[in-house]
Amino acid sequence: MPFSPQELLYEGKAKRIYRTADPRVYLCQYKDDATAFNAQKRGSIAGKGEVNCTVSSHVFAYLAQQGIPNHFLAQTGPTEMQVRALHILPLEVVVRNRTAGSLCKRLGLEQGLPIQPPLVEFYYKNDALGDPLVTPDHIRLLQLATPEQVERLGSLALAINNHLQAFWRSCRLELVDFKLEFGLDEKGEILLADEISPDTCRLWDRGGSEPRVLDKDLFRFDLGDPVAGYQEVLQRVLQAVGSQFLL
């Protein structure tokens, strides 16, 4: 059953979250706004909201089929989805399958090296501090999550990685790394939240001699046309799983 937005709860860089008539359900509205480097670079990618909403809807539905609990309920429009109301943990969980991005800059590594087993990192969601990398001990010190929750986040992230690698392979893409966010439901259970899209996943097409970027790095580093890149990801997803709204 569709719910109309009633009160804007939160507006972030890429989405707006609204209350609905049902306190257990929020409406998530995706925007075309694009940011990088902790919002130091700003712009817009035409159609990004629709791409990210539709891709995320399909990915969340796929993950639910694989037994991964998440907040997705239904896609109710091109840029809108209904989600479960959660208390979002102030952590980003990053899983890396190859060296890329900030990991290379931070540790002086060559880009594109395989990482086995995958690397799991935690970042404190705090714009004023620049979302710093934190250890489980830092998380305990800051009381961001319990040790048991941190352990659960790590195990969930690795399980999600296995499923996402299979999903993106079906779209003829390699999942280099990605960012996850989680929240707690009314029972205190941890559910996957936020989005899974070219904004949050580093996706390479390795069909040629050199990897071809099809993600937010197109905008972040001016590597090509982000509109075309995002639309290509959407078309590959739709070809792989079908083009119907997941109602």
UniProtKB/Swiss-Prot annotation:
Pathway: Purine metabolism; IMP biosynthesis via de novo pathway; 5-amino-1-(5-phospho-D-ribosyl)imidazole-4-carboxamide from 5-amino-1-(5-phospho-D-ribosyl)imidazole-4-carboxylate: step 1/2. Its EC number is 6.3.2.6. Keywords: ATP-binding, Ligase, Nucleotide-binding, Purine biosynthesis. Signal peptide: none annotated. GO terms for molecular function: ATP binding; phosphoribosylaminoimidazolesuccinocarboxamide synthase activity. The keyword Nucleotide-binding applies. Belongs to the SAICAR synthetase family. HAMAP family: SAICAR_synth (MF_00137). This is Phosphoribosylaminoimidazole-succinocarboxamide synthase. It comes from Synechococcus sp. (strain JA-2-3B'a(2-13)) (Cyanobacteria bacterium Yellowstone B-Prime).
